[in-house]
């Protein structure tokens, strides 16, 4: 059983220096090539119902957008396709995934992580942690490769260490991209290949790993609705237990992203106030302020690192 769970989202890669935002991807040569090929694949009268046109329109409205959120909107609002359109959309969706994989492989090829970044420093220090730990990746990249760190189950400082890639990885050349069925929605069977659960093919025990951990760290993950199924039991238990046995640290960019995360948690029926009442500690660390040498944020960061390196401490 891992006593420490580190949950990593795309913000972790961004902190490390990778241009891995979806808005970066849609400006890439890989996406432009995908876009051109998809336009040629459809008849003119079919293009209006295509996924590529939906993504184009969404990006035109905002330079920042989430492809998976747009896929969800597309699945919810588009039905009644004939067999030909379903085949074309399936092909289009598969080509989108290939384009994303090719883009991420290109930008990670020979990438050197900035060792002064918090993300990099955290992974190095985690190897000195005396607690059994699990790293849970919601992104597709393998930062351990940039840092020349092991990728499989290992023993560090006498403690076991596990790695889980929830949505696949570039190393496996297989990624999970799409959306999940939200509460109250009906399955769109014509486009069900876009649901993430239909792309999963092995158990990962993520929910149990987080629930069992006593030290939980989110870095660069928005704790959004799409992924909340993995966190729900943990947050329910953490907000309800009168025995404060857990430390929760959420590392995010700034105050606005902190508010968004709190709103996301509250929207899932979890009281943020109860989390503050029932966790041993709940801290938000803003990377922007740490880099700006803010004394309060630096103190919170140093307290976290010290706790990671200490075997006997409160709450564990």
List each model region and its residues.
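Active-site periphery "cap/insert" segments of enzyme catalytic domains
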Residues: 2-7, 16-168, 207-212, 225, ...
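Generic preference for well-ordered secondary structure
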Residues: 6-9, 127-128, 190-200, 215-218
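Acidic, metal/cofactor-coordinating or nucleic-acid-engaging core segments within structured domains
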Residues: 39-52, 174-213, 226, 262, ...
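SIR2/sirtuin-family catalytic core signature
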Residues: 1-16, 152-153, 205-316
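Surface-exposed cleft-lining segments at the edges of enzyme active sites
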Residues: 103-115, 187-197, 221
């Amino acid at each position: 059983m891992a006593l420490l769970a580190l949950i990593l989202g795309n913000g972790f890669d961004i902190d490390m220096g990778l241009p891995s935002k979806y808005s970066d991807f849609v400006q890439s040569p890989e996406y432009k090539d995908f876009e051109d090929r998809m336009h040629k694949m459809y008849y003119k009268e079919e293009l209006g119902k295509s996924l590529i046109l939906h993504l184009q329109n969404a990006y035109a409205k905002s330079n920042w957008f989430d492809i998976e959120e747009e896929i969800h909107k597309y699945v919810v609002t588009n039905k009644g396709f004939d067999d030909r359109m379903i085949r074309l959309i399936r092909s289009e969706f598969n080509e989108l995934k290939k384009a994303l994989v090719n883009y991420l492989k290109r930008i990670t090829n020979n990438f050197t992580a900035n060792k002064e970044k918090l993300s990099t420093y955290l992974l190095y220090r985690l190897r000195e942690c005396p607690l059994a730990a699990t790293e849970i990746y919601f992104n597709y990249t393998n930062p351990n490769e940039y840092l020349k760190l092991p990728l499989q189950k290992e023993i560090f400082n006498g403690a076991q260490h596990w790695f889980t890639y929830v949505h696949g990885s570039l190393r496996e050349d297989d990624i999970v991209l799409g959306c999940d069925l939200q509460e109250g929605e009906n399955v769109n069977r014509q486009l069900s290949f876009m649901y993430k659960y239909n792309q999963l093919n092995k158990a990962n025990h993520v929910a149990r790993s987080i629930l069992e951990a006593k030290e939980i760290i989110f870095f660069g993950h928005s704790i959004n609705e799409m992924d909340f199924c993995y966190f729900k039991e943990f947050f329910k238990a953490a907000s309800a237990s009168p025995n404060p046995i857990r430390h929760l640290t959420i590392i995010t960019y700034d105050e606005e992203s902190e508010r968004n995360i709190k709103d996301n948690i509250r929207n899932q029926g979890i009281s943020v106030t109860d989390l503050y009442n029932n966790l041993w500690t709940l801290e938000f660390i803003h990377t922007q302020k740490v880099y700006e040498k803010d004394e309060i944020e630096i103190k919170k960061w140093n307290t976290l690192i010290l706790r990671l390196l200490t075997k006997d401490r409160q709450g564990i």
